[in-house]
Amino acid sequence: MGSTGEPDRKRRLSSSVAPGGGAPVSPAKRLAVAPTSEDKKLDFTVLKYKNQKLSEQLEAHKFEYRALENKFAGLKEKQRTHNETLSLVNSSWEQLVADLKSRSFCKSGSPNSSPGSGHNNVQKDGTCAPIERDTLRSLVESGATESSGCLPGCHLGSDAPPLHLSTANALGDIFFPSSDLLQANEECALAALTKLPENDRSKQLQSTSSNLLSSLNNVVQALSNLQLKHKQLAEDYQNQRDSSARKRAEHRRLKEELASAASELEETNYKLAALKAQRDNTQGARIPYPTLGNKSMPEDKVRDKQREMQDLEATHKELSELISKRLVEIKRLHEERIEILNKIATFQNILMDFKSIRSSKAFQLVNDRLQKSQAELDHYQTLLEKLQVDKDKFVWQERQFNLKVDLAEIPERVSTYCESSIADLKKDIQKLRDEKNMLILKLEEASREPGRNQVITKFKALVSSIPREMGAMQSEMTKHKEASLELNSLRAEVHSLSRILSRKERDNEEASCRSARAGSDITQLQSVISDLKQTNKELKLFADMYKRESTDSREIMESRDREFLEWAHVHALKSSLDESKLEQRVKAANEAEAITQQRLATAEAEIAESGQKLGTSRKDLVSLSHMLKSKQEECEAYRVEVECIGQAYEDIQAQNQQLLQQIIERDDDNTKIFMEGVKAKQTQDALHLETYSLRRNLQQESSLMDLYNQKIVSLEDQLKMWSDRVGKLQEDGWQQSVSLSNYQRKLVDVHRDAQKLMQSLDGIQANVGSSRLEVADLLIELEKERFSKKRIEDDLEVMSRKASSLRAKARESAVLEKLRHEVKEYRGILKCGICHDRQKEVVITKCYHLFCNQCIQKSLGNRQRRCPSCSLSFGANDVKPIYI
């Protein structure tokens, strides 16, 4: 209705207010523009109110977000503690698995526990025998590795290997070799007992074996009990884990409910803001102004306006009802929010109360179970160590038994070896006898041959000439060594001379630099002297010029002469002073130049001498290098000769051996005598060496005795020092014991203070809990006050809007009266000026005066056709109709 009536109203207003195109703006139009500015002010206040509401909602959301952040931090801390306990359990379990693996490795490392020792417990394809497989399956199914399956690492997927497989492998490594070992030991024991004779030792062995079997059965029973307890612990841990999962699910559900409640609250806030905006728009709508025209408003239009007003009132009632419902919902949500804040505060206090956490049943149960599991783990570890010790003892006994068996087989092997060695020795003796007979025959043949004395003399001459040649060669080698040493010394001298030459060159360069500096100083001084001379000449010229001037009076001339004399005296003094300084500088420079020239001359002489020495040393070096080359060539020739002589000597030695063999074969008596003489000489030399060594040892022992005496003296001094230090250390120990007792007393006091502090901490925690509850109550009260304040502000704003709307209505009523009066005036203007009843319908084009058609027709019927307003004559063609 309102949307269809708006264009009609605009059309009526445009048709009624446009009598002419260039007419000025009427006052009604100016008044019609005023309410738009008021609407803008109302819109601005509405926007300001909305912004305020949105800021308050933002603050509330921030508070909720902070509360949720605190809750999330508490839950995160709880999760961290849970993760720490879980990591501790995981580490203990991994340590247990590692210990099991190490035990299994120790078991598999025994010599008789290998899978290929001849037992039938392991099949060819590497799979275990049915007994071990059933044992492992029963262990895994009964829960020996369930706790490892409960760890977080087992839920990582197929990529991460589950821990229960490692524990199963470790248990398999322990149980399978132990079963193989038990079976092998049983077989060995049965075989040994069957082979042993029936006596006391065999009975003792049987009794010990039965005792070992009973102890092994006890260990197996203990392991089964350990398995049952482990299964119970795994079930308890699984139950605890299920309960923690349920708690996490409950926590997740509560978080989702909180998020949904927050989202619903946001939606309701958004809807409420939209409804408030609609209400503000309905309250701030403009009152439709009556249209202007030359006739009264029709009844159907009035009815349409009434219907529109009724519809607006109905919508206003609906909106007010909806607003009341939304306010009730907001109150309910506010109460729910306060309840949630109370719950969050209580949860925070519960989570942050360490005393209640420590005193909680779950924490105590977990702590007791951990302690029990730790004690059981230690107990079972000791049992496992005992089992390992028993196993080692059993392996040692088995080794001793095998050693005895091997010792029983040793005599048989020794007898067979002795028989074979006797047969080999008989064969060797027979071969030696045959060789002896052959040598006897060869000696007889050699004794019959002539020329034996000549061979002996040649051999003796050759032997006597060899040491002379060796002495000559050694003397030549010593000469060559001396020459090489001289060459090294000459090289060292050349290096030293080159260093001296480089040093002299550096000194020469420094002296040349100094002389250059002195020359530059001299040139500077000479330039200064020339400048001073020029200034002196100029001053003299100025003095002559002033003397020649005679234009002034006599007194002025006298004063000027005096002044000139004084200035001349001053300049003379300055010049004398400068000349004296310059003379001193010139003298010093000349002396320095003379000294530098002397040094330069000495340096040049030294450079020349060093150059001559360098040339001579280079020449000597060249000659020595030539000599060295020649000596090296000679050494190479001597080496070749020595090698040739050595080869000849080796050949001669071979011939000598052949000749000696021939001589020995020909003449046994001579060789025997010669050997006896050689032996006598060797014994004499050995005796001389022994006497010399004894003397030397005696001297060394005497020197050692002196050293030992010195060491004894030093050790006595050290003993005195150590005794003094021990006394000091005893005193320090006594002082430390006193200080330790003091520290222990302080420690007891500190423990007491710590207990007091713990008690005070408990009290403080209780106070903190109570203060937190008080803070939560204060927050709730603050929230209530904020809510009531918001309600009051909303009511105040509604009342202010009502007051503003009433003021606007009052203003609009006054404006309506004015408009009605103006409408009457405009209607009077639009009515005909002759009859004052009908509307103006025609215009006289000569004077542009408006009248109704009937009055103009009456004037046209008369003879005098004149305008009633200006009495201007017009014709029928001058009358034109208009449409207003």
UniProtKB/Swiss-Prot annotation:
<dbReference type="GO" id="GO:0050832">
    <property type="term" value="P:defense response to fungus"/>
</dbReference>
<dbReference type="GO" id="GO:0061630">
    <property type="term" value="F:ubiquitin protein ligase activity"/>
</dbReference>
<dbReference type="InterPro" id="IPR013956">
    <property type="entry name" value="E3_ubiquit_lig_Bre1"/>
</dbReference>
<keyword id="KW-0156">Chromatin regulator</keyword>
<dbReference type="InterPro" id="IPR001841">
    <property type="entry name" value="Znf_RING"/>
</dbReference>
<dbReference type="GO" id="GO:0006513">
    <property type="term" value="P:protein monoubiquitination"/>
</dbReference>
<dbReference type="InterPro" id="IPR017907">
    <property type="entry name" value="Znf_RING_CS"/>
</dbReference>
<comment type="similarity">
    <text>Belongs to the BRE1 family.</text>
</comment>
<feature type="region of interest" description="Disordered">
    <location>
        <begin position="1"/>
        <end position="37"/>
    </location>
</feature>
<dbReference type="GO" id="GO:0010228">
    <property type="term" value="P:vegetative to reproductive phase transition of meristem"/>
</dbReference>
<keyword id="KW-0479">Metal-binding</keyword>
<dbReference type="GO" id="GO:0045087">
    <property type="term" value="P:innate immune response"/>
</dbReference>
<comment type="pathway">
    <text>Protein modification; protein ubiquitination.</text>
</comment>
<feature type="coiled-coil region">
    <location>
        <begin position="580"/>
        <end position="663"/>
    </location>
</feature>
<dbReference type="GO" id="GO:0006325">
    <property type="term" value="P:chromatin organization"/>
</dbReference>
<feature type="coiled-coil region">
    <location>
        <begin position="696"/>
        <end position="762"/>
    </location>
</feature>
<feature type="zinc finger region" description="RING-type">
    <location>
        <begin position="832"/>
        <end position="871"/>
    </location>
</feature>
<dbReference type="GO" id="GO:0005634">
    <property type="term" value="C:nucleus"/>
</dbReference>
<keyword id="KW-0862">Zinc</keyword>
<feature type="coiled-coil region">
    <location>
        <begin position="789"/>
        <end position="827"/>
    </location>
</feature>
<comment type="function">
    <text>E3 ubiquitin-protein ligase that monoubiquitinates H2B to form H2BK143ub1. H2BK143ub1 gives a specific tag for epigenetic transcriptional activation and is also prerequisite for H3K4me and maybe H3K79me. It thereby plays a central role in histone code and gene regulation. Forms a ubiquitin ligase complex in cooperation with the E2 enzyme UBC2/RAD6.</text>
</comment>
<dbReference type="GO" id="GO:0008270">
    <property type="term" value="F:zinc ion binding"/>
</dbReference>
<keyword id="KW-0833">Ubl conjugation pathway</keyword>
<dbReference type="GO" id="GO:0010389">
    <property type="term" value="P:regulation of G2/M transition of mitotic cell cycle"/>
</dbReference>
<dbReference type="GO" id="GO:0042803">
    <property type="term" value="F:protein homodimerization activity"/>
</dbReference>
<keyword id="KW-0808">Transferase</keyword>
<feature type="region of interest" description="Disordered">
    <location>
        <begin position="107"/>
        <end position="127"/>
    </location>
</feature>
<feature type="coiled-coil region">
    <location>
        <begin position="216"/>
        <end position="541"/>
    </location>
</feature>
<feature type="coiled-coil region">
    <location>
        <begin position="49"/>
        <end position="86"/>
    </location>
</feature>
<keyword id="KW-0863">Zinc-finger</keyword>
<dbReference type="Pfam" id="PF13923">
    <property type="entry name" value="zf-C3HC4_2"/>
</dbReference>
<feature type="compositionally biased region" description="Low complexity">
    <location>
        <begin position="108"/>
        <end position="121"/>
    </location>
</feature>
<dbReference type="GO" id="GO:0051781">
    <property type="term" value="P:positive regulation of cell division"/>
</dbReference>
<dbReference type="InterPro" id="IPR013083">
    <property type="entry name" value="Znf_RING/FYVE/PHD"/>
</dbReference>
<dbReference type="GO" id="GO:0033503">
    <property type="term" value="C:HULC complex"/>
</dbReference>
<protein>
    <recommendedName>
        <fullName>E3 ubiquitin-protein ligase BRE1-like 1</fullName>
        <ecNumber>2.3.2.27</ecNumber>
    </recommendedName>
</protein>
<keyword id="KW-0539">Nucleus</keyword>
<keyword id="KW-0175">Coiled coil</keyword>
<dbReference type="GO" id="GO:0010162">
    <property type="term" value="P:seed dormancy process"/>
</dbReference>
<dbReference type="GO" id="GO:0051301">
    <property type="term" value="P:cell division"/>
</dbReference>
<dbReference type="GO" id="GO:0009965">
    <property type="term" value="P:leaf morphogenesis"/>
</dbReference>
